[in-house]
């Protein structure tokens, strides 16, 4: 279905490619600060800090988008604001990914296949959500180097993520923290439901 999003890349590297990929997927993309400028005149390209997502939030409201996507300087971190322009904390965003990842597993999935790694900065709510969805939560020291190490040692684990906005999708992807791929996965998840106008959930209700 049609989805409108605002995309803020903070004048950093991912901008032009991210627009091209999302538009190729049929997304109605409203670009914000997606042209390259290494002086970063609008805000630092860090989508996990609320102050860097304020312009994105205002643009979502202005354009009536379902949500807004922010990317960091080198395209390995993702941040989101909801339809009200409200910042979504990365561990809550990870919960949306986790629900889809675990629901795709077979009933006889092994413990390793159900293991989700997250860093110590994430909330207990994420750990509880993983358990409720039938997953096995495993807390890891903060740092994407440590997450990559866990995925090498547990190659059947479908996902790992951090409060910094690094999300490592390891089910249909190779375990890399790629913001463009993660944005595409998020849009796929959202697109499975009817639009809010047709009775589907708003982003803030997820």
What are these regions (language model features)?
Residues 1-193:
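Phosphate-binding chemistry for phosphorylated carbohydrates and sugar-nucleotides
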